[in-house]
Each structure stands twice: as C-alpha cells, then as structure tokens.
Amino acid sequence: MALDKDIVGSIEFLEVVGLQGSTYLLKGPNGENVKLNQSEMNDDDELEVGEEYSFFIYPNRSGELFATQNMPDITKDKYDFAKVLKTDRDGARIDVGLPREVLVPWEDLPKVKSLWPQPGDHLLVTLRIDRENHMYGRLASESVVENMFTPVHDDNLKNEVIEAKPYRVLRIGSFLLSESGYKIFVHESERKAEPRLGESVQVRIIGHNDKGELNGSFLPLAHERLDDDGQVIFDLLVEYDGELPFWDKSSPEAIKEVFNMSKGSFKRAIGHLYKQKIINIETGKITLTKKGWSRIDSKE
C-alpha cells in the first residue's frame, strides 16, 4: 500500500500490459496495478501492449487505482483554483478535472459555517493522499502562497478594482489571490462584511508593502460613500430587486410612509445617487444601474 501512494495523485509513465473488455491494465514503476477505462483515453491515442504512456493516477472511492489521460487542473505537487460543486456535513466537494469529485474536509474549512464556500466558488487547493489511498483536497497555506504570488512594487494598481478570491479568512482580515497572481490583504477595518472562502469578489487596491503584497479595501472611496438617506433608498432598492415606484414627483406622504424622510431629503438623496451613477431616474420609478449592483457584488 505504501508503494501505491508514491504514484497516486501524480502524472507518471505506466506500461500497458493488457486489455480486459473495455479496460486497459497498466503497470506502475513499482509494480502497481492500475486500470484505465477507455472513456479516459485521448481520442487520437491508440495504446499498444508493452508501450509506456503518460497518465494521471487517482484512487476510486474504495482506494483502487485508476488512470486517465485527461490531465486534471491540480496534482499533489501543483496548486490551482478548483470549482466547488457542493457542500455537505463532510466539507466541500470540488471539481479538479477528474471523473470523480474530491472532498476538502470540514476540519480544513472556516469554523464559522457562513464563511464556507458555496457551489460555484473556487478554492485554492492541491491533492492530498492518505495512507489508505484516499484522495482529498488540501487548502493552500500562507507559506505556499508566499512562493507563488506575483509581487507588485509600484502604485500602478492603486485605486484599481480587481477580482480576487479569498484563500484564507480570519477575523483580522481577508487574504486573497487574483487570477494574475496578486496577493491581497484586506484588513477588517476595510470591509463591512466578511467574504466566503473562495468567493469571487471585487477589491479596490489601496497600496502595497515591501514584499510586493497588495493592500485592499471592500469599501468605496470616501466621496462615493452614501449618506444615511441615500443608504436607506439603496437598501430598499436592493430588497425590491433594483426597482421602486418612486421618483422626484412622488407625493410627500407616500415618500414619508415608505422612506421615513421628507420629500426634500428624498430628492436630494436620489439626485446624489443619480450623479454617482448608482441609480437611473425614470418616469414613475427609480432603478439600480450596473454600477449600483456592483456595490453589492463587491460588498460595499
């Protein structure tokens, strides 16, 4: 069993030793017995007995070894983002490009369950193989990210908004990595809500440190922040799917009943929201713009 573990989760050259029905029989470098289903072969590849070919080796749920020529996005030596398929009591199940899903155990996920990833999120992981040949996803540690991120030593990205995913979530702040490899830290004072592990979020860059790590914020620039009346209107727009049947000609009584503000305050607030391109003012209604919706997506 220990010998099997040497090749599991990695790409190896295996010898084709036979064909049993629709299943090829392969032999590993240490004599391991490995099976290959024809559905896991490259379309343009014909295998010959006695020849060696490159395969990725993985265990099925009972620990039996299988091979595939469809190389996965990650191996036990390579980290990458993998899509979350679902979560359950055991943890998060991810797609790494194999015929079977891979589990990231619940013990490795945040203690606060609301910060667990949701289907469609992406976790930065590698593969881990235990002594029984069971395969799991392992989250990237801080030391791993230290060796793979792209450093930035200038202010060219300052005030730019980029997409990134948290690979580590702590009370003190959120640690994120972008598709371009930028490592970003968002201090707790620069967020109103904590993003989920693996959630795609928009983060505004506010600086960098000597290591080339970026500092970010989930908060808007000071001049873009909403006053109390504007926030009330914005929150109601979000609650009612981005549209409210009110505008600058609505009656003072209706405005007072719904928004608990005077008509003058309402007109000033929607005027401010309009100038910031957060809402559109139409005949008989106000609606959220694309920029308005993006404030929610970036947790502003």
Swiss-Prot record:
Keyword Nucleus recorded: no
Signal peptide residues on this chain, from the entry's feature table: none
Gene3D superfamilies (alphabetical): Nucleic acid-binding proteins (2.40.50.140), Winged helix-like DNA-binding domain superfamily/Winged helix DNA-binding domain (1.10.10.10)
Alphabetized InterPro entries for the sequence: CvfB_fam, CvfB_S1_2nd, CvfB_S1_3rd, CvfB_S1_st, CvfB_WH, NA-bd_OB-fold, WH-like_DNA-bd_sf
Protein name: Conserved virulence factor B
Keywords assigned: Virulence
Family indicated by similarity: Belongs to the CvfB family.
Function: Contributes to the expression of virulence factors and to pathogenicity. Involved in the production of hemolysin, DNase, protease and protein A.
Keyword Iron attached: no
Top-level division of the source organism's lineage: Bacteria
One Pfam match: CvfB_2nd
